[in-house]
Amino acid sequence: MSLDIITPPATTPISRAELKTHLRVDTTAEDDYIDTVILAATDYFQQRSWRQLITATYGLYLDEFPTDYIEFPKAPLQSITSIVYEDTNGSTQTWSSSLYEVDVKADVGRLRPIDGESFPGTDTVYNAVTITFKAGYGDAATDVPDLVRSTIKLIGAYFYENRQNILTTGSVSEIPVPMALGHLINQFSLREFV
């Protein structure tokens, strides 16, 4: 299984003005850096929680369909755009949405064939199945839960005050944060994918 972002979010869960107010910064000298901090804090939260905060479109690639159901590695799942696969003859097919059902209410979105149906057979190639889906709380920052937005501000403040951590770490998700921030993130974490 692999995951690729197709259409990134159009905005961030907090604005520059919100983080500047939180930081008590009233100059414009560091606006570009603050924008970078917002992106890093958002990325950190999303990587650690397996959640997508603002609506984005993803491609999920599978070598074959499972036998029972598919769980989506980004939540909350909004919708399935398409399911395309290579059939056993090597031809590209689109699986009709009338043949499967989607659970967008569960913490981890799921998809399975409707009763009486089964997943189609696939060719024995890598990434034979491509599922395009949308995930996120919504299109606007105000759609994101307030506790998540507050957590992003706290992570952003930590990154702002500890700049060397952002510059010396290979991956945003490897940056150490205070234990309290880790606990806030864990409240939203989808542990099945960690």
Regions picked out by a protein language model, each given a short descriptive name:
Residues 1-194:
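Divalent metal-cofactor coordination and adjacent catalytic microenvironments
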